Amino acid sequence: MRNKAHGFPHRISFDGEPDRAKHASKRANGTINTKPQERMHQANPDQ
């Protein structure tokens, strides 16, 4: 087989536990962007 390394493990592995909430992306103030529509309405109160 050309251009393929033999005996190397696969780079992507889905084994193990899923990501935990403590690793979830958050803003600096600790909030998560779960309701963008609500945030947009707060930013534009005249509409």
UniProtKB/Swiss-Prot annotation:
Pfam families: SspK (PF08176). Induction: Expressed only in the forespore compartment of sporulating cells. Keywords: Sporulation. This is Small, acid-soluble spore protein K. InterPro entries: SASP_SspK. Residues 1-47 are annotated as: Disordered. Residues 12-22 have a biased composition (Basic and acidic residues). GO terms for cellular component: endospore-forming forespore. The keyword Aminoacyl-tRNA synthetase does not apply. It comes from Halalkalibacterium halodurans (strain ATCC BAA-125 / DSM 18197 / FERM 7344 / JCM 9153 / C-125) (Bacillus halodurans). Disulfide bonds: none annotated. Belongs to the SspK family. GO terms for biological process: asexual sporulation; sporulation resulting in formation of a cellular spore. It is found in: Spore core.
